[in-house]
Design a protein with these regions (language model features):
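Kelch-like beta-propeller repeat domains
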Residues: 1-202
């Protein structure tokens, strides 16, 4: 567990680990380039034993939210944070998104940030804004996913998302007007374009 918010003007950057065998909490000492004090970010355990931290929001000195699109990596053996090199179409700054491991990639969907909903379909004119972005775990390259579904996912934030047997489930959240209990299921795959380069599709 990392970070958090006290509901007022303070965010946290401390880390806590729960031992499921002894049922005790510990606060490990970490080093390196740790994320700032924030909340609403995501943590994903990669196949190489590193924890990836993306996005989130912190409270600025004037009380104005500061949104992030940083990607940090924690080596769980050395407990050292780093900023891995990543390329491609970087996601816009956001929080309350979901980043879900799907095969050898991470699917980033939803969130709230500069301009509101992080989707051009919702009227956000922020350059490079996209609701669904995929990070290749091997090449560390971001790509905007192409939606082939005539009924695409309803944009939201504060939702939950999980992958089950190649299908991406999104439930709940806030759609900008009200809380929702909608459940969306989409199939995630890869298609090859003319140049042979694969692009993620949903």
């Amino acid at each position: 567990m990392h970070g958090g918010w006290n509901g007022s003007s303070k965010c946290f950057k401390d880390m806590h680990v729960f031992d499921t065998e002894t049922f005790t909490w510990v606060s490990p000492t970490t080093g390196g380039l740790a994320p700032p004090e924030l909340y609403g970010h995501t943590l994903n355990l990669s196949s190489n034993g590193h924890i990836l931290c993306f996005g989130g929001v912190s409270v600025g000195a004037s009380g104005i939210p500061v949104y992030h699109n940083d990607l940090r990596s924690l080596d769980t053996e050395t407990m050292i944070w780093s900023r891995p090199r990543h390329t491609g179409q970087f996601p816009t700054c956001r929080y309350s998104h979901q980043m879900t491991a799907v095969g050898g990639s991470y699917v980033l969907f939803g969130g709230w940030g500069v301009g509101g909903m992080q989707s051009s379909d919702e009227g956000n004119k922020t350059p490079g804004v996209a609701s669904t972005v995929v990070l290749d775990a091997d090449t560390m390259e971001w790509k905007v996913a192409e939606c082939l579904n005539p009924n695409p996912l309803m944009y939201c934030y504060g939702h939950q998302a999980v992958e089950v047997q190649g299908h991406y489930f999104v439930f709940g959240g806030w759609n900008g007007k009200q809380a929702t209990n909608a459940l969306f299921i989409c199939e995630i795959g890869q298609v090859e374009e003319g140049g042979g380069e694969e692009e993620p599709v949903a």
